[in-house]
């Protein structure tokens, strides 16, 4: 009987831990509806990828940068954050890092910029002048 209780408790706590780090995906069409709200939009692609086209108002924090983890974790924990990358790999990893560090309101755009462009949404380009 005691083994059953202990195993049940371990299972319950394990499930709770897994759920606490679950990644919340949002469709690009749902993001369009909240785009002008108080969410901070973060593009975790490289600077070169960002320059080739990004969603309006996005902040670029390069996932591969040596300072990435310090930069992303410097955001206030109560910040509402929407993440995207090219397809979801880097943004999902970033969401996990944030969740593991106590951030609560994190969304990831399903399909990333690839899905965004595929569905005909506008992108901005970075231009440099000499």
Regions found by a protein language model. Give the residues of each.
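Rhodanese-like catalytic fold shared by cysteine-dependent sulfurtransferases
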Residues: 2-4, 15-39, 47-80, 86-130
């Amino acid at each position: 009987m005691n083994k059953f209780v202990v195993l049940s408790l371990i299972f319950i706590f394990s499930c709770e831990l897994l759920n606490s780090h679950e990644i919340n995906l949002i469709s690009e069409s749902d993001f369009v509806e909240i785009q002008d709200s108080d969410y901070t939009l973060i593009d975790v692609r490289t600077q070169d990828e960002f320059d080739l086209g990004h969603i309006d108002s996005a902040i670029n924090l390069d996932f591969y940068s040596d300072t990435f983890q310090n930069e992303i974790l410097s955001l206030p924990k109560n910040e509402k954050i929407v993440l995207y990358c090219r397809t979801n790999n880097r943004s999902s990893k970033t969401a996990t890092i944030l969740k593991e560090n106590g951030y609560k309101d994190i969304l990831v755009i399903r399909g990333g910029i690839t899905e965004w462009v595929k569905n005909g949404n506008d992108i901005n380009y970075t231009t440099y002048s000499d």
